[in-house]
Amino acid sequence: MKKRIPRIYIKYFLQINQVISLSKSYTHYIKKVLRMKKKDKLEIFNNTNYIFFSEILEINNHTIEIIILKKQIKNLESPLLIHLGQVISKNEKMNFSIQKSVELGVNTITPLFSEYCNFQNKLICFPKKKIHWENIVISSCEQCHRNNIPEIKNPEYILPWCKRTYENETKIVFSPSATFTINELPEKINCVRLLIGSEGGFSFLEIEKIIQYGFIPIKLGPRILRTETAVIAAITALQIKFGDLS
């Protein structure tokens, strides 16, 4: 069996024959966790449509140096652009939702506050939360071989986010009480603004405004899904019909 080449993200411009000193966190990971040695290979990505093949030049207690050997175009992005508005849920559920939505091809994620969300008064905590979520996105890209990093937007309140409309964007909210199914959507959709609620759902006012702002309520099926299950089911259904899972 062919040995898997580890992937890491480096956030700056890369070129052939460039020598790079890796960060302390990657040095620890490569040396202590992966137990890699001199001349072992690494795959690098840097938020472009390229992957870069590299080799370890030097490895010691404090740093690892690698050299970029070659690059290759590799675009794994779906033709369907998805901007996910995810109402903020409890830590592990939110982490899981972000991780799986990245693996399934979401391009942008905006964490949202809603009336039934328990985090409205904790805005002070969210700069650290955002960094944590961005690290989850990068780890997910390392795992699923995406080379373009989805963007985590700053958290905001649900209704201003829902009110915004961009050209050629279809607004969708999945709701167990909806009557439309995904098969009743137009045959071709290129860009989706997808809204997923938290465990408590939406208030009556929020539902009224969400519909007023142009969101199409779609039914996923006969069962009530947890928020972290709903995000997987919704994105998968959209990618099968309009994206790259068909």
UniProtKB/Swiss-Prot annotation:
Q: How does it assemble?
A: Homodimer.
Biological process (GO) annotations held by this record are: rRNA base methylation
For this record, an example GO cellular component is: cytoplasm
The molecule here is called: Ribosomal RNA small subunit methyltransferase E
Q: What does this protein do?
A: Specifically methylates the N3 position of the uracil ring of uridine 1498 (m3U1498) in 16S rRNA. Acts on the fully assembled 30S ribosomal subunit.
Alphabetized Gene3D superfamilies for the sequence: 3.40.1280.10, Hypothetical PUA domain-like, domain 1
List the PANTHER family.
Answer: 16S RRNA (URACIL(1498)-N(3))-METHYLTRANSFERASE, RIBOSOMAL RNA SMALL SUBUNIT METHYLTRANSFERASE E
Enumerate the subcellular locations listed in this protein's record, separating them with semicolons.
Cytoplasm
**Molecular function in Gene Ontology:** rRNA (uridine-N3-)-methyltransferase activity
EC top class, as a word: transferase
Regarding protein family, the annotation reads: Belongs to the RNA methyltransferase RsmE family.
The record's catalysed reaction(s) read:
uridine(1498) in 16S rRNA + S-adenosyl-L-methionine = N(3)-methyluridine(1498) in 16S rRNA + S-adenosyl-L-homocysteine + H(+)
Keywords assigned:
Cytoplasm, Methyltransferase, rRNA processing, S-adenosyl-L-methionine, Transferase
Q: What is its EC number?
A: 2.1.1.193
